[in-house]
Amino acid sequence: SRAAGVIATAKHFPGHGLTTIDTHHDLPVVDTTKDELFAADLLPFREAINAEVPAIMTGHLLFDRIDPFYPVTLSRVFLHDVLRRELGFEGVVVSDGLEMGAIADHYSLPDTLVRLFKFDVDLILLYRDYDVVDIVRMVEELIEAGELTEDDVNRGVRRVLALKRRYGLVDPEAL
């Protein structure tokens, strides 16, 4: 993929194999343990990380026996503890679309943004329903209110810029 100028993304972490619910419409609840997840669904992600996949996209699924409160996309347990710490992923984490029912119907946008930045999601997928200027303003307001720090945001910026440098998509002198 790199030779063709494409940045590969493994998705949807930690796997959609245990649900038939379409996350565009609702939030699936998956009843499995962490050990079961590591023994099956996480295997392709472990292999992708070992092969140095540059990015991983989250899945909007709630694993109620692992994190009963938040879906993977918003979960410290999955994003920080499992993906970053236990699996050792240092690349770019991409959210799945935030307009999808699994997120938009259950969580407010400001709360979603706080969790995304706090728990190391680097690229946030937003499309038709949001204006980027409004999102930037909202992030600035969250920083001013003390709900986010500039470092929360800049961690992702640094990872995205490192990925762009790795693929020759940014002039290092311009930074």
Residue ranges of each PLM-predicted region?
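Second-shell residues forming the walls of enzyme active-site clefts
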Residues: 1-152
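Mid-to-C-terminal alpha-helical segments outside catalytic/metal-binding sites
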Residues: 144-172
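Cofactor-pocket helix-loop regions in the catalytic cores of large enzyme subunits
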Residues: 175
